[in-house]
């Protein structure tokens, strides 16, 4: 059996889910630190919207080998985030401790 590299890639939905889970964790930590009340930053579908967030900056690292994420899915994630009120920049880099490849996201509210 021959498996093409596209069959081994992470789906857009899985990439979006991983990103949203990581961002939700960052927002929860931020809320604890700031001890500020604001409206729920997630819409009814569980996607992060940022609509009611005060200004904040979040850093997210996802340990995913680069060959498992297509440029198309990454670009779609960045576009969808911008449509939801977030400014997201991404960069591939190696973890300094483990040498594992990871994607780094810098997330700010627009």
Give the predicted meaning of each segment.
Residues 80, 85-110:
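C-terminal edge-of-domain segments
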Residues 2, 73-75, 94, 100:
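Short, well-ordered helical secondary-structure segments
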């Amino acid at each position: 059996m021959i498996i093409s590299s596209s069959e081994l890639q992470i789906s857009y939905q899985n990439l979006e889910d991983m990103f949203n889970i990581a961002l939700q964790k960052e927002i929860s930590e931020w809320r604890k630190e700031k001890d500020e009340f604001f409206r729920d930053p997630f819409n009814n579908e569980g996607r992060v919207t940022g609509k009611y967030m005060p200004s904040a900056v979040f850093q997210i690292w996802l340990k995913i080998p680069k060959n498992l994420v297509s440029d198309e899915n990454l670009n779609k994630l960045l576009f969808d985030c911008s449509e939801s009120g977030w400014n997201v920049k991404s960069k591939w880099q190696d973890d300094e401790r483990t040498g594992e490849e990871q994607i780094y996201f810098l997330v700010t509210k627009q």
